[in-house]
Amino acid sequence: MRALLAAAVFILTPAAFADPAEDFAALIADYEAHEAARDVIRRGRRGDLEAASVWPDASFEAVAAHDRAMAGFLERLEAIDPDALPDDQAANYAVLAYQLESAAAIPASRAALTPFTNDSGFHTRPDFVALGTRLRTVEQAEAWIARIEALPEYFAQHRAWLERGLERRITQPRDILPGVADQIEAQIVAPEESTLFTPLAGLPDSIPDEERARLRAAALEAIETRALPALRELHAFFVEDYIPGARESLGARDLPGGAAYYRDLVRYH
């Protein structure tokens, strides 16, 4: 019996006297790793070719998994006594607490219902990414072409959230939506005029002429057969379904649960 008690004490003691500083450092490392893993745009810019060939995963499953992860991080943070941390970690604790509490108050699954404003959003992100993309190798160019080809799924994921928002009566105000539809329509241009083609227009001379021609032709085909049809479908959805079904009021307070949502917006944004 004494041996069992001794073993129990030996097992429980490390957990009972866990170092808050070590727990906090591990939490920060896990949080940063989680954020880095899901930020495929940044990873792509840093040379990760697999990340450079896809868009952020906005599927229901991925967003729900992110919300669960953030809730888990907050639970771990709340188990750490900030007064037990070194003085130089107080600011880090406060910043992380703000970020995680904000994510709990306004989870990604709520924000995903209205993933745009009157001037930008998921629908403009591909063009912004294109303008910030510099291709230096054949492999980078092929990754960008793959990313263009992935646009239908990217738009479909966000459309699914917009449809869910319509079902729940959580939409952006109708007054701003014609301008958003115009932004989408403005992207429906000839492939060679598309902002998505911009990275291919600046391919370096270090890539042989024949290869540059091949890559540009592949990009133009991807824009013609993948990006433009997806943009046309998205525009039609906005005009035919989203705008007619959107709320007429302007204030966030008028949304279901709007008073609490407005309070959280004021507090965390």
Model-predicted regions and their roles:
Residues 3-12:
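Sec-dependent N-terminal signal peptides
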Residues 18-269:
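N-terminal maturation segment of proteins
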